Amino acid sequence: NKGYEDFEDFLSKFVSRKRKNIKKERDLIKRMNIKFKKVSNISDTVWDEFYLFYALTYARRGQRPYLTLEFFKELKNLDPIIIFAHKDDYNIAAALFFKSSDTLYGRYWGAKEDINFLHFETCYYQGIELAIEQKFKYFDPGIQGQHKLKRGFEPIINSSYHWIKNSEFRTAIKNFCIEESQHIELYFKQALKTLPFTNV
């Protein structure tokens, strides 16, 4: 968040063609009369509905969700926010957000209906609006996703830490990571060139 006043201010920094694409995506959602509401102080009933959407996302791919409903209910002390998409008085999708002192984190989502651009609106555009509105310095929508670049998410290099007990396996992984880091650096530079901003 570079001190944007609102989503329009954020979009004003895009090149014209990319700005039009985002507006077109958002207009399609608005024309379907899909609205959004933020929920904090999340009750068990709200978690139940969120989890249904989350689980459906996996079921569509023939998979089981790797997190349980009980896991999500344990997160209440972290003061998360759920943004629900609703249409005709029914919730149809939801995205889960966490916050730190300066960062909004978008992590999990799910939908009852498969609607074009609903994922982008619920997880990214609503998240951007929330980050601007609550003056978060950063909005982290999660790792990976080429589609995030053209929506204004600048690439960052992240790290994860692991301990591998087997020393031979640990050495092989270490060597792979050293080699991979060169490819990541190259990809990072290429990703910067694809950003939609006028000053890039």
Residues covered by each model-derived region:
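C-terminal domain-closing interface element
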Residues: 171-200
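Residue-level detector of functional hotspots within protein domains
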Residues: 20-22, 69, 90, 125-127, ...
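Acyl-donor binding region in acyl/amide transferases
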Residues: 101-167, 174
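A conserved beta-strand-loop-helix scaffold within acyl/acetyltransferase catalytic domains
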Residues: 1-116, 162-163, 178, 194-200
